[in-house]
Amino acid sequence: KNKKIKFTNSSTIENIPLRKNKIDLVIDCTGSFKKFDNISKYFKEGVKKVLISAPVHDDRALNLVYGINSYLLKNSDLDIITGASCTTNCLAPIIKVIEENLGIIRGSITTIHNSTNSQTILDNPGTDIRRSRSAFNSLIPTSTGSARAISLIYPNLKGKLDGYAVRVPVLNSSLTDCVFDLKKS
């Protein structure tokens, strides 16, 4: 009752009044701070825990998919927790069933994904000719970190999965296609 939750908006962590407002938990959904050096700025401002809505590829972060490896949170002393990515959350339950029952030798992942804010809305010159195409009018093949992110959830699959993405001009949807070479048929 009558509790206030403060929201802030800043492109730099140092400009957020975290210590002044005695903030001990930050939920970061910016997608901007995915490396430990950037995330650690929160701790310098007095924050105790950071929950990030994207994978963090660092041993100092615990990447979780609820219902798959979320039990690890109970005994973890790590201060950076991630909710992985939308594609990782889609893949992890599928991979759990297949890996536990059939075993995965290697695999390929394709994610058909809606446009993201890293894309341009109009064709323009750029260093990546594919990402320079209009997100409104193009099917854009690009990279995905999903195969690498899955190995954070399933370390035994590190180096066994590869993947790519196709960005498509839809508002909010995703489809993931997986092909696996299995130990058992």
Question: At which residue positions do the language-model features occur?
Answer:
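N-terminal Rossmann-like NAD(P) cofactor-binding subdomain of oxidoreductases
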Residues: 1-121, 125-132
